[in-house]
């Protein structure tokens, strides 16, 4: 073979070898996407076919930057819960898998912001700055990572801190009929965390826009937005947003807890959450159970509230305190959702419509309220003065029923009733006016010592304010001792008793006048 032919052959060999090497090492730059189509769109849901590889609760993407969560995964089609405005979606539109689950922005940048469950800002303050993202659904802390509840969470409400104490890491249910002050108790608790190194997350689920705006205005006015994140879904939002709202709020709170911070999260309210889940389940043709709720409604709430805990020091020592709110109908505490949440939580605060109508605010029915773990976290200074108070108030509530029938009462019974009326008057307080620990202990000690018994009921509010103003003048070191595990010393007790007695002197009439002005 001639030299030119050899040269051509070797050149071709080199070329083919280079092509073979290129084919062997070639990696396609194309990313495969699984695309399905919408078969049907209904209120808040869409049925989708053509996504055989989709996972349960995987996020899927629709046109118009609308997302949904795969809720029902069947062999031929999936049921998707829509998380945005779906008015433009129609049968035949494409649907794409994202390969990830729903998550939310977390971090210090959310403090002071009002967002929706997707992390989108609602307050016209620009985009949300976040340091990380966390999945909405996260497993609760293992048992061995949890620590006992030992530190109190002061609400600033005398009736709660004294008789139904809450600890950091506890789950305390707030329930009552409509318009009985449930949200007011939660908001007052948030206001009282100012200066307490507690961050707050307020989650409004399916609430009226006007009511949410009022709550946010109160938080801004009192300076509470500095340490609060507000997660909002309105009544006209898709039910899917209402369903994921409490999980988003909990993930935001868990981020701070895992950093070693103490966090308070308020769910207002889980009745709307249960109704949104019921609506979605019925639309997806899931079998209904009691009151048409699906069979897993208990699990839906238990897996949410089990994420509230107090972590061991090795895990950072943070805590997440949950205050779920539930609305009852006609004072029926034994309905399905209320009984579920009573069994899940560590106690409940029940608000009575009867007390509300009498003007007793907050309208807490102490006999139907309980805190199962908060008592262990209550400060010793409280325990020293509240034990006798609980007994006296319970006796008063029992005897008050008989007094309404106009029965003749002996002198001792009349004293118990008069003392109980003054306890009830002292436990009342206006909205958005939390009371300091020193003020509460001074008032409660004066109540236990029966110093208020000589004060006419009409002057109880002024008398209590006088005691609170006097308590504000206590030495700083004495006020600091209240917030420790130390018991009240005899000297401190004597100081408080003398202070209360001096403050009440102008309000106690002479004996003859006292007999004329005492309540029947």
UniProtKB/Swiss-Prot annotation:
It holds the Pfam family ATP-synt_ab. It catalyses: ATP + H2O + 4 H(+)(in) = ADP + phosphate + 5 H(+)(out). PROSITE patterns: ATPASE_ALPHA_BETA. GO terms for cellular component: plasma membrane; proton-transporting ATP synthase complex. The record marks 369 as: Required for activity. Its main location: membrane. HAMAP family: ATP_synth_alpha_bact (MF_01346). This is ATP synthase subunit alpha 2. It comes from Polaromonas naphthalenivorans (strain CJ2). The lineage of its organism: Bacteria, Pseudomonadati, Pseudomonadota, Betaproteobacteria, Burkholderiales.
């Amino acid at each position: 073979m001639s030299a030119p032919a050899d040269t051509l052959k070797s050149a071709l060999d080199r070329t083919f070898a280079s092509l073979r090497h290129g084919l062997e090492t070639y990696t396609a730059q194309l990313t495969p996407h699984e695309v399905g189509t919408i078969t049907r769109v209904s209120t808040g849901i869409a049925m989708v076919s053509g996504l055989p590889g989709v996972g349960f609760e995987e996020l899927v993407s629709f046109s118009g930057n609308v997302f949904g969560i795969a809720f029902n995964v069947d062999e031929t089609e999936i049921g998707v819960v829509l998380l945005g405005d779906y008015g433009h979606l129609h049968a035949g539109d494409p649907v794409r898998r994202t390969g990830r689950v729903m998550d939310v922005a977390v971090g210090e940048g959310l403090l002071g912001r009002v967002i929706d469950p997707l992390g989108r800002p609602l307050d016209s303050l620009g985009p949300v700055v976040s340091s990380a993202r966390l999945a909405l659904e996260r497993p609760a802390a293992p048992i061995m990572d949890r620590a006992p509840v030992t530190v109190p969470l002061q609400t600033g409400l005398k009736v709660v801190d004294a008789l139904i104490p809450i600890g950091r890491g506890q789950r305390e249910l707030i329930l009552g009929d409509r318009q009985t002050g449930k949200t007011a108790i939660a908001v007052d608790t948030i206001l009282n965390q100012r200066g307490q190194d507690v961050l707050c997350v307020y989650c409004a689920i399916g609430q009226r826009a006007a009511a949410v705006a009022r709550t946010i205005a109160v938080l801004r006015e009192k300076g509470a937005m500095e340490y609060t994140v507000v997660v909002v879904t309105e009544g006209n939002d898709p039910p899917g947003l209402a369903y994921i709202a409490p999980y988003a709020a909990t993930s935001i709170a868990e981020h701070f807890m895992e950093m070693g911070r103490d966090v308070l999260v308020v769910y207002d309210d889980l009745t709307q959450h249960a109704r949104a889940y019921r609506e979605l389940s019925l639309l997806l043709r899931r079998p209904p159970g009691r009151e048409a709720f699906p069979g897993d409604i208990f699990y839906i709430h238990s897996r949410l509230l089990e994420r509230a805990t107090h972590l061991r020091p090795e895990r950072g020592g943070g805590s997440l305190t949950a205050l779920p709110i539930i609305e009852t109908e006609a004072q029926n505490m034994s309905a399905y959702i209320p009984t579920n949440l009573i069994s899940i939580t560590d106690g409940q605060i029940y608000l009575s419509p009867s007390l509300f109508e009498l003007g007793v605010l907050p309208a807490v029915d102490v006999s139907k309220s309980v805190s199962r773990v908060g008592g262990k976290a209550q400060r010793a200074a409280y325990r020293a003065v509240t034990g006798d108070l609980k007994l006296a108030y319970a006796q008063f509530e029992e005897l008050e029923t008989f007094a309404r029938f106009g029965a003749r009462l002996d002198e001792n019974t009349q004293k118990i009733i008069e003392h109980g009326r003054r306890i009830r008057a002292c436990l009342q307080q206006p909205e958005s006016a939390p009371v300091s620990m020193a003020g509460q202990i001074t008032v409660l000690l004066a109540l236990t010592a029966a110093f208020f018994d000589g004060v006419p009921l009409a002057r109880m509010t002024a008398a209590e304010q006088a005691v609170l103003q006097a308590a504000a003048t206590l030495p700083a070191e004495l006020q600091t001792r209240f917030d420790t595990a130390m018991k009240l010393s005899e000297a401190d007790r004597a100081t408080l008793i003398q202070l209360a007695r001096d403050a009440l002197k102008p309000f106690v009439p002479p004996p003859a006048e006292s007999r004329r002005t005492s309540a029947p």
